[in-house]
């Protein structure tokens, strides 16, 4: 019987699930919005919410915990610098999931998962250059 078994398997091994969630969390933090299937979106939400809470804590141990989970130092830097400060006064509820119809090939239910109050201009690697340019302009002024 399946009593008391939390979480979805998503037809993957435990290691595959862990790697997939790490990659999805990194993409979500980098781009601030991703399109995925509804069950994956529902599973990734608590993972990223806990990462944002780690970012708000801001100490070295929290940063190391975040790096051990998503394994991308640049994304962790964005999480701790930009995203954590944006949600400093908010207690949870950093993400929203919106249903986005069905996928053409297999009719899987899709969802958009995004940060509430997200930066609409965030575009991954291009965004890092833009943020750096804005920081330099702010320092010069």
Curated annotation (Swiss-Prot):
Signal peptide: none annotated. Pfam families: Ribosomal_L17. GO terms for cellular component: cytosolic large ribosomal subunit. One of its GO terms (molecular function) is structural constituent of ribosome. InterPro entries: Ribosomal_bL17, Ribosomal_bL17_CS, Ribosomal_bL17_sf. Belongs to the bacterial ribosomal protein bL17 family. Part of the 50S ribosomal subunit. Contacts protein L32. This is Large ribosomal subunit protein bL17. It comes from Sinorhizobium medicae (strain WSM419). The gene is rplQ.
């Amino acid at each position: 019987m399946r009593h008391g078994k939390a979480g979805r398997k998503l037809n993957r091994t435990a290691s595959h699930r862990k790697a997939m969630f790490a990659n999805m969390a990194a993409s979500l933090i980098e781009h601030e919005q991703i399109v995925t299937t509804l069950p994956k979106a529902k599973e990734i939400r608590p993972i990223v919410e806990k990462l944002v809470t780690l970012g708000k804590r801001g100490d070295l141990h929290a940063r190391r915990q975040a790096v051990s989970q998503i394994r991308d130092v640049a994304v962790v830097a964005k999480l701790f610098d930009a995203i954590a400060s944006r949600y400093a006064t908010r207690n949870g509820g950093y993400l929203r999931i919106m249903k986005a119809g069905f996928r053409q090939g297999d009719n899987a239910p899709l969802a958009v998962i995004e940060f509430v109050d997200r930066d609409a201009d965030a575009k991954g690697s291009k965004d890092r250059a833009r943020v750096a340019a804005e920081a330099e302009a702010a320092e010069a002024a």
